[in-house]
Amino acid sequence: ERIELARLREAFPEDILEVSEFRGDLRITVRRERIAEILLFLRDDPALRFNFFSECLGVDYLDPATGAPILGKQWRFEVVYNLYSLHNPRTGEGRNARLFIKVGVPEDDPVVPTVTGVYAGAEFPEREIFDMFGIRFEGHRDMRRILMADDWIGHPQRKDYPLGGERVQFPDGRYGPSVAERVVQHPGESFFGR
C-alpha cells in the first residue's frame, strides 16, 4: 500500500470512501466535511509533505439522457484536488509525488468547506468552480463570480445548462450553423465517420 493511503487510513479511518489508481496516480475520495483537515494533514505530515497545490476542479457526472449521475456515482458533482509533494534538495523534504483527493458533492446540497486556509492558491479555483458549477465553498472570504458577469443566470459548466448560441455573420455574408444544426463527432470517431 502506498504511503499516502496508509497514512490517511491511519489518521482518518472513517473518512476514506473510495480508492483507485490510474497510470500510477492515486485517487482517494474522502468525506467532503473533512476535506480541509485532510489536506492540512497531507501538507504538514513529515512523511508526506504535499506542499504544492496545483489546482482544484469541478466535475459534473450528470447523464442528460437519464437525469442521474453516470458511472454509478452517488452524487452528481465532484471537486478534485491535485496535490504534489515536491522534493527540496536543501532540506530533504518532499517526495516528488502526485496525489488526487476527491470529494463527492450532492446536487441538493452543493457546498464544500473551503481549503484556502490550507492552500492560499485555492482561492481563485474555488471561485471558478462556484461560477461554472454552482458549488459553494463554505468559509471562502470572497465567494462571487470570477468569469461570468455578476448578473449571469445559471452555471455554464453544468451538463443541464441550456445550450444557447447567437447567429454570427461572417465577413463574406454567410451565417454559421445554429447550435441545433451542428453535428458533433463522437470522440471515438474520425471526421470521416470511421
Question: What label would you give each PLM region?
Answer:
Residues 1-194:
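Terminal low-complexity/charged segments
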